[in-house]
């Protein structure tokens, strides 16, 4: 009986020691758990790009008297990692919109809008006097696009990862690039002698 109780207590202690502990972390805190692209990198890149754009003289000129309509193309991932570039694109779009200087056309949702307008205008269930009419959507004046690239170097137990984000703002009427910039992040990892 005593051996069974001791064995059960020992098993409970072992299983309890293997349990996971979950806690909330600060979403704005610097994340340095891996050399891979992470949330800190996303926030840094999005913030630096939008700040650079808003401080640009050419962007100040085009936003001085109006809020231009921008289409933001999803950032292209040219790295060897799986990086959710939609999150980077969303962060940049949100920061730009919150600046109060731009308006946006969400091209990812245009097909859904088209389906809804077709339903409203071609279905007997919808009161035609309240249906939204075709041809009233506004087109973009500018397109923001870019890519994220990386270079990875390994030397023995050391690893070096260099990320570069490049973005451009193009006037869709003239094809002129109104703004362009790059931001860079370098991360390094070294293993200790014992691999700890």
Task: Tell me the role of every PLM-derived stretch.
Residues 9-11:
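Hydrophobic helical h-region of N-terminal Sec-dependent signal peptides
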Residues 19-101, 109-110, 115, 189, ...:
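A structural "domain/chain start" motif
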Residues 19-22, 141-189, 193:
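Amphipathic beta-strand/beta-sheet edge segments enriched in Tyr/Trp
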Residues 100-106, 134-137, 174-181:
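Short C-terminal domain-edge/linker segments immediately following a structured domain
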């Amino acid at each position: 009986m005593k051996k069974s109780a001791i064995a059960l207590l020992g098993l409970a202690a072992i299983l309890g020691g293997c349990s996971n502990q979950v806690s909330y972390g600060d979403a704005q805190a610097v994340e340095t758990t891996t050399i891979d692209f992470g949330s800190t990198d996303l926030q840094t890149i999005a913030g630096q790009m939008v700040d650079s754009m808003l401080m640009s003289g050419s962007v100040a000129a085009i936003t001085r008297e109006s809020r231009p309509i921008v289409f933001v193309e999803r950032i292209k991932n040219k790295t060897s990692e799986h990086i959710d570039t939609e999150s980077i694109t969303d962060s940049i779009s949100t920061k730009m919109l919150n600046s109060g200087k731009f308006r946006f056309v969400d091209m990812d949702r245009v097909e859904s809008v088209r389906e809804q307008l077709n339903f409203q205008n071609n279905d007997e269930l919808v009161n035609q006097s309240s249906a939204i009419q075709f041809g009233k959507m506004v087109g973009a004046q500018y397109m923001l696009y870019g890519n994220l690239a990386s270079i990875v170097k390994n030397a023995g137990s050391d690893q070096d990862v260099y990320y570069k984000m490049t973005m451009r703002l193009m006037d869709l009427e003239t094809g002129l690039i109104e703004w362009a910039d790059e931001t860079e992040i370098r991360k390094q990892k070294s293993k200790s002698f014992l691999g700890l």
